[in-house]
Amino acid sequence: RHPSRDKLVQLCFGMRLDETKASELLERGGCAALRPYVRRDVIIAFCLNRGMDISACDDLLWGLGEETITARPRDRRV
């Protein structure tokens, strides 16, 4: 069984990876790399490349109307 993409993204933040290394980890974990045509992925890449922590990235995602990384399913924005 593979971890979810969001779990792998959380790991990327914990390991302080940049966009390139994060995409590699996602692919090795059986998920799609960060995609430049997906708004949420662009925001995540922006945060990773600037060394932001996961809570700051979640705040930015929420503020821009995107699904956060650490939200539980019932808390996710529709």
Language-model features: where?
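A short, structured loop/turn motif at beta-sheet edges
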Residues: 15-19
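Intrinsically disordered, low-complexity acidic/Q/S/K-rich activation/interaction tracts characteristic
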Residues: 74-78
